[in-house]
A protein has these predicted regions:
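Helix-capping/transition residues at the boundaries of transmembrane alpha-helices
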Residues: 12-14, 61, 65
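Signature of the 12-TM Major Facilitator Superfamily
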Residues: 22-23, 74
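Membrane-embedded alpha-helical hairpins and interfacial helices in multi-pass inner-membrane proteins
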Residues: 4, 39-48, 63-146
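Small-polar-interrupted transmembrane alpha-helices in polytopic inner-membrane proteins
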Residues: 24-36, 78
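Helical-face signature of the major facilitator-like transporter fold
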Residues: 29-30, 55, 113
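Hydrophobic transmembrane alpha-helices
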Residues: 1-15, 19-20
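Membrane-embedded alpha-helical segments of multi-pass membrane proteins
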Residues: 3-8, 48-56
Length: 146
């Protein structure tokens, strides 16, 4: 994923609905498989774990609502935790052979995925929280679709 790439899916989840964002995440995950030129799965399960689960996890950002900033923050945190857990589990299952000496599959996957995804989720969450969500809801003409 590129820097701040979760922002559009987080906004779909928060401004429209979690269901729409989950489906959008599936679509993004499928498209990413074809549009990322160097991506090659090591196992068919990786397609499910990394591309469908982790992309759709961002849809959970809208499950607490969008009427208060703390609800948006809780949703972003939940979505980030689910996404990081999915990537970490995928790392253990499919990339344990890359583990550094003495680290083991879990240690390697946690270190790798935390170093990649925590900054990504923090920056994306900060951007979404800095946006005028009330004005955006008004501009798109939606208060909440559920």
């Amino acid at each position: 994923m590129s820097l701040c790439s979760p922002v559009p899916l987080l906004l779909v989840a928060i401004l429209w609905s979690p269901k729409l964002a989950i489906v959008s995440g599936w679509v993004c995950g499928i498209l990413a498989m074809f549009l990322i030129p160097v991506w090659q799965p090591v196992h068919w399960g990786q397609i499910f774990a990394e591309h469908l689960v982790c992309f759709s996890a961002l849809g959970y950002a809208g499950c607490f609502g969008n009427d208060k900033r703390w609800k948006v923050l809780c949703g972003i945190l939940l979505a980030s935790v689910i996404k990081i857990c999915g990537h970490t589990l995928s790392g253990v299952l499919f990339f344990s052979q890359n583990a550094w000496d003495g680290w083991g599959a879990w240690g390697y996957s946690l270190a790798y995925n935390f170093s990649q995804n925590i900054p990504l989720c923090l920056l994306s969450g900060a951007i979404v929280l800095a946006l005028p969500l009330g004005s955006l809801k008004h501009a798109i003409g939606k208060e909440r679709l559920a």
